[in-house]
């Protein structure tokens, strides 16, 4: 039986969740509040993030979710298999070794600010699985959240990044390259986005 996945952008639909009669509610990678946790717990056991919202790394997510579903051995095997696959695939990209990277979100309609996913965010943390590291300017940013908003005037935080990872396409790269501030970032100039 396939799990039911809910879009929670407009809040949790407790009635729909209850109607699906879940055995367990998986929210290891979520931002549920204590109040939401308490309400969901009235429906079924809830696996919530252990420390901070949106900061449960993928290995921990798999382990927690698999354990909650009574499939701990399968979860451990999946983590091991994925680690082996990552190692196998990254072996083909030795030129990434020693490079720094930053995972960002840019809105092409408003390049006056952007967001950096911090090393505690699973998307950003995955970059280290690929053999990349974070520039010192990013590593020393606060870790209370999974991301931080940066004004384009503070673009210097990206100057040491060899690679920028971002959601978007070639149009985003063109917009970044033609922006007066963002276009000065070496990774943007070099097309390493």
Where are the regions a protein language model picked out?
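Structural recognition of the beta-strand scaffold that forms the well-ordered cores
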Residues: 24-28, 47-48, 101-104, 163-166, ...
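Short helix-initiation/N-cap motifs at beta->coil->alpha
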Residues: 6-14, 141-152
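Solvent-exposed loop/turn segments at secondary-structure junctions
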Residues: 30-33, 52-55, 106-111, 169-173
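Short helices/loops that flank or line small-molecule/ion binding pockets
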Residues: 14-21, 149-160
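Extracytoplasmic substrate-binding proteins
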Residues: 38-110
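Acidic/His-rich segments in extracytoplasmic proteins that coordinate ligands and/or metal ions
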Residues: 1-68
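Alpha-helical, coiled-coil/dimerization segments enriched in small aliphatic residues
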Residues: 113-146
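Structured C-terminal subdomain patch of bacterial secreted/periplasmic proteins
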Residues: 67, 158-193
């Amino acid at each position: 039986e396939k799990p039911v996945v809910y879009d929670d952008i407009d809040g949790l639909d407790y009635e729909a969740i209850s109607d699906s009669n879940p055995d367990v509610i998986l929210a290891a990678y979520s931002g549920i509040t204590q109040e939401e946790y308490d309400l969901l717990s009235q429906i079924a056991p809830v696996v919530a993030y252990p420390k901070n919202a949106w900061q449960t790394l993928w290995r921990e997510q798999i382990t927690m979710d698999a354990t909650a579903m009574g499939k701990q051995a399968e979860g451990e095997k999946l983590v091991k298999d994925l680690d082996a696959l990552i190692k196998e695939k990254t072996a083909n990209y030795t030129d990434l070794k020693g490079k720094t990277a930053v995972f960002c979100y840019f809105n092409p309609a408003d390049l006056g600010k952007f967001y950096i996913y911090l090393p505690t965010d699973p998307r950003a943390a995955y970059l280290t699985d690929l053999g990349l590291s974070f520039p010192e300017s990013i590593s020393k940013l606060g870790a209370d959240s999974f991301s931080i908003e940066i004004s384009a005037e503070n673009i210097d935080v990206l100057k040491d990044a060899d690679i920028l990872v971002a959601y978007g396409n070639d149009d985003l790269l063109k917009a970044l390259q033609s922006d007066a501030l963002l276009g000065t970032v070496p990774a943007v100039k070099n097309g390493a986005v």
